[in-house]
Amino acid sequence: MPYQLENRPPDLRESMYFPEIIRGIGTITKHFLKNLFFSRDANPDILARKRGGFGHSDNVTLQYPEERAPYAPAYRGLHRLVPREDGKPRCVACYMCATICPAQCIYIEAAEYPDDPVEKYPAKFVIDELRCIVCGFCVEACPKDAIRMDSGEHTPPSYERSAQIWDEKRLLRGPPVSYQYDPWLRRGSPSIPPDKLEEMRARAKPFPTVATDEASQTPGFSVRALAAEAKDRAQAARK
């Protein structure tokens, strides 16, 4: 049964808003004092590089982008295609990554090797990093471990949307073997002989703690270099 609502006028306490204002100021002051005197950063890499705190604080300020906080080993960064030792991509253009992608940001065109008509390769492999939701489904669905998100780099800034369209040439930058936490190196693979697997494990390098332009987490993979490259392409397109 419908009933009529009665809108009563606010009383003096509600109309002045003073209690809520005081409560908000108290919350801000509490967190301010807590962060100023008693906070502890749980990241040991950050604590090791602290600049010296005020009171008992271990808060630090990193001079970004020259200094960057380290990413966790499980961080999902920019995509990269894993090359074989001969430089060809591991990808066999099975379309599993493009099919499972919820954002539909992967586009593949398949082609056949002239000397091996059984196996295919991606004649075109494009990822729109702006549409990507960084879910990692493409990495899990790939049967050949051909695509990874272990670059340790986030999407570089750019002035043009076209600079975030990554093709197979840019995606193939990076070493064929990843880092020591690579699950393929830990569990092995039927397609890799045991002696070859041990050699790959011996060559794997530890995941770096801090990414800089001088020591990037992936050789030849620099955020500043990619941003400069995108800017040069945009300037060339305007001419």
Curated annotation (Swiss-Prot):
Entries under InterPro entries matching the protein: 4Fe4S_Fe-S-bd, 4Fe4S_Fe_S_CS, NADH_quinone_OxRdtase_chainI
Cofactor note: Binds 2 [4Fe-4S] clusters per subunit.
Cofactor (UniProt): [4Fe-4S] cluster
Enzyme Commission number, as recorded: 7.1.1.-
Keyword Transmembrane: no
Catalytic activity: a quinone + NADH + 5 H(+)(in) = a quinol + NAD(+) + 4 H(+)(out)
Domain 4Fe-4S ferredoxin-type: 81-111, 123-152
Principal place of residence: membrane
Pfam families per the UniProt record, alphabetical: Fer4
Binding site for [4Fe-4S] cluster 1: C91, C94, C97, C142
Membrane topology: Peripheral membrane protein
NAD found in the keyword field: yes
GO CC aspect terms: plasma membrane
Family assignment from sequence similarity: Belongs to the complex I 23 kDa subunit family.
Quaternary structure annotation from Swiss-Prot or TrEMBL: NDH-1 is composed of 14 different subunits. Subunits NuoA, H, J, K, L, M, N constitute the membrane sector of the complex.
Function, as annotated: NDH-1 shuttles electrons from NADH, via FMN and iron-sulfur (Fe-S) centers, to quinones in the respiratory chain. The immediate electron acceptor for the enzyme in this species is believed to be ubiquinone. Couples the redox reaction to proton translocation (for every two electrons transferred, four hydrogen ions are translocated across the cytoplasmic membrane), and thus conserves the redox energy in a proton gradient.
HAMAP family: NDH1_NuoI (MF_01351)
Protein name, as recorded: NADH-quinone oxidoreductase subunit I 1
Species annotation: Anaeromyxobacter dehalogenans (strain 2CP-C)
